[in-house]
């Protein structure tokens, strides 16, 4: 039986590729997709979800737009990484269908209520929508199997010295998620910076030769440019968000540890930092499965294998 999931995302090149991977995988049943503001403005990320589902010929999946700003802060976007549209690079189709009239939280709640089994929430943007769901529907917590997020880091940040972008945008929301009591799986920079796509991998995807693999290669062409900056020390481009879906499909290619994680919401220098109690110093019980390593080649091979689905 396929695993039911809800995807909450802010496309974003790597979010778009996470959608491609999820919808090429029969092990997963994508029951709904919601959009969050982050990589671009809320209007653009919602439009990008619709564009990707139009491309993938999946207008049957319910879509709803989410919160227009973080819980307690003004919105920060990453247009320097993802371009003016949020998905600069390839020529993507215009949306062929409209989102639902309700909010992301309403769609998530409806999906959870109607599901015969607990649903996994995959969140690849800021945690605003998920936190709003948890706060407004405590009766539905038992319908959530786990929350798999791309966000945070045990080590260095990528938006500030201490903070990863998704958590930095809405640290209060992330803290609600981590302290919810629901199992959390964290794909932070410790693992996603190892899930790099090299130039040769992009050509491998392009050579698969179907329309979707070509679009993925073109998305990566654009994404690759930002990560050429020598400050990062990367060989390729880290494919952050697909790590969440890849973990659901092939957990054996990832190394994880069980640890307590908290989010710093007020620090002068560390606002948005995920504090991972690696050495069990706080006495707090672990609340998260934290990814720390990945078999990079296995990750690339999984992407290439699933791109064949679109032949």
Swiss-Prot record:
Gene Ontology CC terms: cytosol
SUPFAM superfamilies: Nucleoside hydrolase
GO molecular function: purine nucleosidase activity; uridine nucleosidase activity
Active site location: 240
Gene3D superfamilies from the UniProt entry: Ribonucleoside hydrolase-like
Enzyme class, UniProt record, top EC level: hydrolase
Pfam family, one: IU_nuc_hydro
Protein's GO biological process: nucleobase-containing small molecule interconversion; purine nucleoside catabolic process; pyrimidine nucleobase metabolic process
EC number: 3.2.-.-
Keywords (A to Z) from UniProt: Glycosidase, Hydrolase
Domain of life: Bacteria
PANTHER family for this protein: INOSINE-URIDINE PREFERRING NUCLEOSIDE HYDROLASE, URIDINE NUCLEOSIDASE
The family this protein is said to belong to: Belongs to the IUNH family. RihA subfamily.
Protein's job: Hydrolyzes cytidine or uridine to ribose and cytosine or uracil, respectively.
HAMAP family recorded: Pyrim_hydro_RihA (MF_01431)
Name of the protein this chain belongs to: Pyrimidine-specific ribonucleoside hydrolase RihA
Species this chain originates from: Salmonella paratyphi C (strain RKS4594)
Source organism phylogeny: Bacteria, Pseudomonadati, Pseudomonadota, Gammaproteobacteria, Enterobacterales
